[in-house]
């Protein structure tokens, strides 16, 4: 087995500093090479290479819990842990996950932000109860510190005597947001008479050196800013080391050894460069955070030239049009401005649209208050991340019956990011909520109509749309959106009906076209609304079609099948329902087309299943 990258703690300890630096350089080359082909999180991993090497050198990865927040910076850890032979399969079907997974030998699963410190605290408690001497090490980015959960954990950790190391990877991705509001409080500690007097003396001294005064003044201000995070952690009762150079292996190793020897909760503040080692990525955080395949030399994305507009781009343009038309429209995103397309609205209307960092709970409740004040909030959020604010959705929006719009991006299978990111639960957790209206567009024109309707609608409303492009284009004429009204797209006397929801309509249409080529037919309904259902249309359909196939990109439990069965029971209608929604299991990573084939949700597999009902 090749051991170019895989090293035990003992092996790393025997390497010289120069050899460790060469190892880091080789790992960067490997990461760039693989991500350029498979896509993935590039810049965050390039910025954490030395941190990961130092963790493996100072601590024992076989016994000490290594916890990677979000874990989108864990590629070096994977290489060091013996995954180099399968690293080329990163994010591929049946290959290595882009995140940490226990099934691959990691301590804990990760994919969502700000869980690492809580996990470290829990691990500390378990270790203490077992009487063991292990030390949890949590690597967390500064962006993740914008979420309240991280501070909840720090609050408890600071009041403990646990041996625990928090390695803060400060790559300035969003340090101004997690630290910004708190630094206003902390800056009061420096706004004393002594500090102000001292600052004036330094300023007078700099006047004597006119050529370097500007530079020195800037460095002076920066040096005081560096104190801010240290004060925060120390006031919480944590030991603090830093800031250190997160790319200087000697500094990092020394700091980790110092923290290890303390046998107390300690924060090491390491400053890093996101995208380190790949010039095109350095300093361009958003572009190179999560990427598809790209050409290493030019940095250009490798994608089809005939690519259609994405659903996100369509959403962004439509919301821009609506915002220019209706001045009471406001909006928010939680650290995903470019991912949700809200960046363009923040740029054009900075007083009406906000990025509140990784703070989904705050995002939802703050918009609820704006709705209470007469504004019309659009919350642009990935389906998977709305899970993080479920209580706020219920408590602050549904119970209040407020006019809040939830635009749920990345609904359905999202592909290579895998089980932590699949958007297949939103229908199940939103449908039970009183006052909520749920719908989904099948194509671009229906997206426009639905967004216009959502603005006019009274009460909380949510619509979902896929990652990437809509499959359908202009195959069907759009209809006016009316509350709880479906659209009958293909109408005939067949005893079989296809009921599609959102992107599921496209899949149903693809199967139907194949059937028609075999001289078979079926009714095709675009439900448009999951809640409320079009009971009038469905009652009419039940008179002629006795076999209904459900096409929807949600799990079966709590999905369209559940809603349809409730409707049939309500009216004592006898129809056989066959659902092609997802089974009761988490969906692994891989290209969407390959994942669907594995799940037998591709068109050919669905066609085979449907044909069994034709005689």
UniProtKB/Swiss-Prot annotation:
Binding residues annotated for thiamine diphosphate, in chain numbering: 72, 111-113, 143-144, 171, 278, 360
The organism sits in which domain of life? Bacteria
Q: What class of enzyme is it?
A: transferase
The entry's free-text remark on the cofactor is: Binds 1 Mg(2+) ion per subunit.
Question: Known EC number(s)?
Answer: 2.2.1.7
What's any GO biological process attached to this entry?
Answer: terpenoid biosynthetic process
Q: What InterPro entries does this protein map onto?
A: Dxylulose-5-P_synthase, THDP-binding, Transketo_C/PFOR_II, Transketolase-like_Pyr-bd, Transketolase_BS, Transketolase_C, Transketolase_CS
Q: Which GO terms describe its molecular function?
A: 1-deoxy-D-xylulose-5-phosphate synthase activity; magnesium ion binding; thiamine pyrophosphate binding
Checking Pfam families in the record gives:
DXP_synthase_N, Transket_pyr, Transketolase_C
Quick check: keyword Protein biosynthesis in the entry?
Answer: no
Pathway participation: Metabolic intermediate biosynthesis; 1-deoxy-D-xylulose 5-phosphate biosynthesis; 1-deoxy-D-xylulose 5-phosphate from D-glyceraldehyde 3-phosphate and pyruvate: step 1/1
List the NCBIfam families.
dxs, PRK05444.2-2
Please give the function described in this protein's UniProt entry. Catalyzes the acyloin condensation reaction between C atoms 2 and 3 of pyruvate and glyceraldehyde 3-phosphate to yield 1-deoxy-D-xylulose-5-phosphate (DXP).
Q: Assembly and interactions?
A: Homodimer.
Q: What is this protein called?
A: 1-deoxy-D-xylulose-5-phosphate synthase
Q: Which organism is it from?
A: Campylobacter jejuni subsp. jejuni serotype O:6 (strain 81116 / NCTC 11828)
């Amino acid at each position: 087995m090749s051991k170019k990258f895989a090293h035990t703690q003992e092996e790393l300890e025997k390497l010289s500093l120069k050899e460790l630096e060469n190892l880091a350089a080789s790992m960067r080359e490997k990461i760039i090479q693989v991500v350029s082909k498979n896509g993935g999180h590039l810049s965050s991993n390039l910025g954490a290479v030395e941190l990961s090497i130092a963790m493996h050198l100072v601590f024992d990865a076989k016994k000490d819990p290594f916890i990677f927040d979000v874990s989108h910076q864990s590629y070096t850890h994977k290489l060091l842990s013996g995954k180099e032979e399968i690293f080329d399969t990163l994010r591929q079907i049946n290959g290595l996950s882009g995140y940490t997974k226990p099934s691959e030998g990691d301590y804990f699963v990760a994919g969502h932000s700000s869980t690492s410190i809580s996990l470290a605290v829990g691990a500390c408690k378990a270790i203490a109860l077992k009487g063991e001497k292990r030390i949890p090490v949590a690597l967390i980015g500064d962006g993740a510190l914008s979420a309240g959960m991280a501070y909840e954990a720090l609050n408890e950790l600071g009041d403990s005597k646990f041996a625990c190391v928090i390695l803060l990877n400060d790559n300035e991705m969003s340090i101004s947001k997690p630290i910004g509001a708190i630094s206003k409080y902390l800056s009061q500690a420096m706004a004393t008479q002594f500090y102000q007097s001292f600052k004036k003396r330094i300023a007078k001294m700099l006047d004597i050196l006119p050529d370097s005064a500007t530079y020195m003044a800037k460095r002076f201000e920066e040096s005081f800013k560096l104190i801010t995070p240290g004060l925060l952690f120390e006031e919480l009762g944590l030991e603090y080391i830093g800031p250190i150079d997160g790319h200087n292996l000697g500094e990092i190793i020394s700091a980790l050894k110092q923290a290890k020897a303390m046998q107390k909760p300690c924060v090491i503040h390491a400053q890093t460069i996101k995208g380190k080692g790949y010039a095109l990525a350095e300093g361009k955080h958003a572009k190179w955070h999560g990427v598809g395949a790209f050409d290493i030399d030019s940095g250009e994305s490798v994608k089809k030239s005939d690519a259609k507009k994405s659903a996100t781009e369509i959403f962004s343009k439509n919301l821009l049009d609506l915002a220019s038309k209706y001045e009471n429209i406001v909006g928010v995103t939680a650290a995903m401005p470019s991912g949700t397309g809200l960046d363009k609205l923040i740029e054009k209307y900075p007083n009406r649209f906000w990025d509140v960092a990784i703070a989904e709970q705050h995002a939802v409740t703050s918009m609820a208050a704006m709705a209470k004040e007469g504004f019309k909030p659009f919350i642009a959020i990935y389906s998977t991340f709305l899970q993080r604010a479920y209580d706020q959705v219920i408590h602050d929006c549904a119970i209040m019956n407020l006019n809040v719009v939830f635009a749920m991006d990345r609904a359905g299978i999202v592909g290579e990011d895998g089980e932590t990111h699949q958007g297949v639960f939103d229908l199940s957790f939103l449908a039970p909520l009183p006052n909520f209206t749920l719908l989904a567009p099948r194509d671009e024109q229906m997206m426009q109509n639905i967004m216009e309707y959502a603005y006019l609608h009274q009460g909380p409303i949510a619509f979902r749309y896929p990652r990437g492009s809509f499959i359908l284009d202009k195959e069907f004429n759009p209809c006016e959106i009316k509350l709880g009204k479906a659209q009958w797209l293909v109408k005939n006397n067949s005893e079989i009906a296809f009921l599609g929801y959102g992107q599921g309509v496209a899949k149903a249409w693809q199967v139907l076209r194949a059937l028609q080529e075999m001289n078979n037919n079926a009714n095709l309904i675009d439900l448009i609304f999951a809640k409320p259902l079009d009971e009038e249309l469905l009652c009419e359909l039940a008179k002629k079609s006795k076999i209904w196939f459900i096409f929807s990109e949600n799990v079966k439990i709590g999905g369209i099948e559940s809603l349809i069965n409730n409707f049939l029971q309500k009216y004592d209608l006898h129809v056989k329902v066959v659902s092609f929604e997802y089974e009761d299991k988490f969906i692994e990573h891989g290209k969407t087309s390959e994942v669907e084939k594995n799940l037998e949700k591709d068109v050919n597999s669905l066609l085979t299943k449907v044909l069994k009902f034709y005689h």
